[in-house]
């Protein structure tokens, strides 16, 4: 569970920004996006393979330049 200490002397905006940053670090937003719908394991592997190929192409381009 994510918790943020709110200091009454500081503005609310700063506490909200700290909360958003903590959520980003914890990966809550990404996890919610991933859990919106079920993805079969075979589909996960296909996506992972596609991403690996894409990363390899990008790294080849960078190495060539």
From Swiss-Prot:
GO terms for cellular component: ribonucleoprotein complex; ribosome. Pfam families: Ribosomal_S21 (PF01165). GO terms for molecular function: structural constituent of ribosome. The keyword Ribonucleoprotein applies. Coiled coil: none annotated. Keywords: Ribonucleoprotein, Ribosomal protein. One of its GO terms (biological process) is translation. This is Small ribosomal subunit protein bS21A. It comes from Francisella tularensis subsp. tularensis (strain SCHU S4 / Schu 4). The gene is rpsU1.
């Amino acid at each position: 569970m994510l918790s943020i200490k709110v200091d009454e002397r500081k503005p609310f905006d700063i506490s909200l920004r700290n909360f958003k940053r903590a959520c980003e670090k914890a990966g809550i937003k990404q996890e919610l996006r991933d859990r919106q719908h079920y993805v079969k394991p075979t589909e996960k592997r296909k996506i992972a393979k596609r991403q690996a190929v894409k990363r390899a192409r990008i790294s080849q381009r960078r190495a060539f330049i």
